[in-house]
UniProtKB/Swiss-Prot annotation:
Major localization class: cytoplasm
SUPFAM superfamilies tied to this protein: GroES-like (SSF50129), NAD(P)-binding Rossmann-fold domains (SSF51735)
Binding site for an alcohol: 49, 70
Protein name: Alcohol dehydrogenase-like 4
Length: 380
């Protein structure tokens, strides 16, 4: 390609401050260095993690200017030295948590947080040299990276350990959803909780991740799936995802866990906290059966808080854990999951509520912020 080895100037949506509208502007994108890949992003969507970072909810994670975004799909523009599994023109998914294949975590079954390329909201530069690949076009000042990916840009540079090559016949606009939210939810149901047939499930928060948990639970043969959300507009999509019972905490005269106990006659086997709320996490824990209950935390929490659980409560037979990317190893396990989805295991169309051009990204952010969107797919 003519651009190979050269700096590319392209459009990016840059965050300049907490809660400020993203600025669509020209940025410079350096060529990929050793073991890096430069990607032309074709589709990206907005996740609540992007929204949290944009709002600057956790002060320790604030870094500006910054290019957010991590759920996307695109085509390789060029590769750096040492990259052998990909080449220009390949279709790829950026993955916010990588897999080097060599560390003790990557070599261990059941673990997916690579020691070198695991997701780190504090990290704002490339792993290889501690520098950025983005610069302002006017004064050449550095622009920081986000979650290993920074997909709110027409071009981005990513470590090859965080890039998954996919079949060019796969529809990129659909499988882009599998680079974060859908995989996170379904994987939590399968890989982390390991939902068993005929079991009961409660899901707190019915955004994209929560609905993906429901899809995963239904695929595993759960007998009853309960959805909890303060926005009743989400209940219809919940039904389509397999949820049979709904609780709106604002309309209940009892605590949510008390209602769940009544519905299930003793609590669910599995609960999932997908709301990023410490109160929801507490209710999710108390909603599980005393003896076999498992709670999986998936929501992004705004600031560090202690778990709302007394240590002695864990002696009641309940357990609690958390999950990143649904426990999937992104490069070795995700390809089979993508194939399963495209063969009809999940309805990926369910998750795309809006489609907008890239320059309308601030409108997309507001739709998600107001609870009016599930996934807004941006076309670059």
């Amino acid at each position: 390609m003519e651009t190979q080895g050269k700096v590319i100037t392209c459009k990016a949506a840059v965050a300049w401050g907490a809660g400020e509208p993203l600025v669509m502007e020209d940025v410079k994108v350096d060529p990929p260095q050793r073991l890096e890949v430069r990607i032309r992003i074709l589709f990206t969507s907005i996740c609540h993690t992007d929204l949290s970072a944009w709002k600057g909810e956790n002060e320790a994670q604030r870094a500006y200017p910054r290019i957010l975004g991590h759920e996307a799909a695109g085509i390789v523009e060029s590769v750096g030295e040492g990259v052998e599994e990909m080449m220009a023109g390949d279709h790829v998914l950026p993955i916010f948590t990588g897999e080097c294949g060599d560390c003790r975590v990557c070599k261990r079954d059941g673990a997916n947080l690579c020691e070198r390329f695991r997701v780190d909201p504090m990290k704002k530069v490339m792993v290889t040299d501690g520098k950025t690949r983005f610069f302002t076009s006017k004064d050449n000042k550095p622009i920081y990276h986000f979650l290993n990916t920074s997909t709110f840009s027409e071009y981005t540079v990513i470590d090859s350990a965080c890039v998954l090559k996919v079949d060019p016949l796969f529809p990129l606009e659909k499988i882009s959803l599998l680079s974060c939210g859908v995989s996170t939810g379904v994987g939590a149901a399968w890989n982390v909780a390991d939902i068993q047939p005929a079991s009961t499930v409660a899901i707190f928060g019915l955004g994209a991740v929560g609905l993906a948990v429901a899809e995963g639970a239904r695929a595993r043969g759960a007998s009853k799936i309960i959805g909890i959300d303060i926005n009743p507009d989400k209940f219809q999509l919940g039904r389509e995802a397999g949820i049979s019972e709904f609780i709106n905490p604002k309309e209940s005269d009892k605590a949510v866990h008390e209602r769940v106990m009544e519905i299930t006659e003793g609590g669910v086997e599995y609960s999932f906290e997908c709301a990023g709320s410490i109160e929801a996490l507490r209710e999710a824990f108390l909603s599980t059966n005393s003896g076999v209950g498992v709670t999986v935390m998936l929501g992004v929490h705004a600031s560090p808080q202690l778990l709302p659980i007394h240590p002695m409560e864990l002696f009641q037979g309940r357990s609690i854990t958390a999950s990143v990317f649904g426990g999937f190893k992104p490069k070795t396990q995700l390809p089979f999951f993508i194939t399963q989805c495209l063969q009809g295991l999940l309805n990926l169309d369910l998750f795309i509520s809006h489609q907008l051009p890239f320059h309308d990204i601030n409108e997309a952010m507001q739709l998600l912020h107001q609870g009016k969107a599930l996934r807004c797919l941006l076309h670059l």
